[in-house]
Amino acid sequence: MALETFVNSEPFTFGVELEIQIVNTHNYDLTKAASDLMRLIKDAKFPGNITPEITESMIELSTGICRTHDQALGELHAIRDTLVNAADQLNVGLCGGGTHAFQQWSERQIFDAPRFQYISELYGYLAKQFTVFGQHVHIGCPDADSALFLLHSMSRFIPHFIALSASSPYVQNVDTGFHSARLNSVFAFPLSGRAPFVLTWSGFEEYFTKMVNTGVVNSMKDFYWDIRPKPGYGTIEVRVMDTPLSVDRAAAIACYIQTLARYLLIDRPLKLSEDDYLVYTFNRFEACRFGLEGTCVNPQTGERRTIAEDILDTLDRIAPHAAALGSRAALDEIGALAKARVNDASWLRTIFKQEKSLNETVRQQCLRWRE
């Protein structure tokens, strides 16, 4: 199969995708209701889209093409409200969070769609264990080579996105010690991690053709990279974030990525090199394990600082671009998180410490999702 032609798109437009948990309102375990939710909302009017995901206990909402923070917020609130109204009719709850705190993966049911059934057959139990919930952000790129430049430039900031969105400290009744345990599930897939260091679209087409010829991949969907190009949309897709506990947080993170993209493509502050990836896995682990308190190492200078400090320094650098995009309010929220060194994983641990119950913690996640 040939690689799709890269469709040039309006630079720095963006779209947000959020995978959402569906829980019962008895003990707040995951429940099977995606098909019923899809039936209830099929005639509803809302921006963006709502689609099923790999198991019946999750559903995905996505915005349309956004240009500003206000637009993204408005669309996310409207789609969220549509889903919440449908969930109320079914007496089920919806919430964010990168993992469900105590669900048993073996109880999950694969959604009845050809691709999901194929993934289940190919990956076995990993497919059910993949009942984890992420935020993806698409960024519009003017051309294919710019997309690859942005992809590799943005990779330096992967720890920021992980630490800011982290909301998965609990897995199967256990505090994992991680801020984002979700990404450990993604890493189990053979084509996960980071994209190959290729800076021209012709070079990327050559790589893709070689991979297809091995029989390992059929399409771009088979790559579970942290950031991957989406040629049919004319975007790159940042895929490392946990689903935040609120749509407001999701919009703020998306606009941080949008503003950073404008800075990286217009100012071109980075000279890209394969050596940029020497500390990639280390920095990624630090963000997953320790959140905003984690250490990140600059691959070119060897300088070490906390992820929170690196975010605050980055916010200063990209401030002029925030003014141009109207994303100052979003970046103020990001700055407040970095200064306080708190994220949704911190919030979940605080609630559990108060309530001594993961069931109650998930119930409060559902309340937070409606705010």
Swiss-Prot record:
Gene3D superfamilies: 3.30.590.20
InterPro entries xrefs: GCL_type2/YbdK_subfam, GCS2, Gln_synth/guanido_kin_cat_dom, YbdK
The enzyme's E.C. designation: 6.3.2.2
GO biological process, one term: modified amino acid biosynthetic process
Catalysed reaction, written as an equation: L-cysteine + L-glutamate + ATP = gamma-L-glutamyl-L-cysteine + ADP + phosphate + H(+)
GO molecular function: ATP binding; glutamate-cysteine ligase activity
Pfam families registered for this protein in UniProt: GCS2 (PF04107)
Keywords tagged on the record: ATP-binding, Ligase, Nucleotide-binding
Enzyme class: ligase
Functional description taken from the UniProt entry: ATP-dependent carboxylate-amine ligase which exhibits weak glutamate--cysteine ligase activity.
Protein family membership: Belongs to the glutamate--cysteine ligase type 2 family. YbdK subfamily.
Protein name: Putative glutamate--cysteine ligase 2
Organism, scientific name: Burkholderia thailandensis (strain ATCC 700388 / DSM 13276 / CCUG 48851 / CIP 106301 / E264)
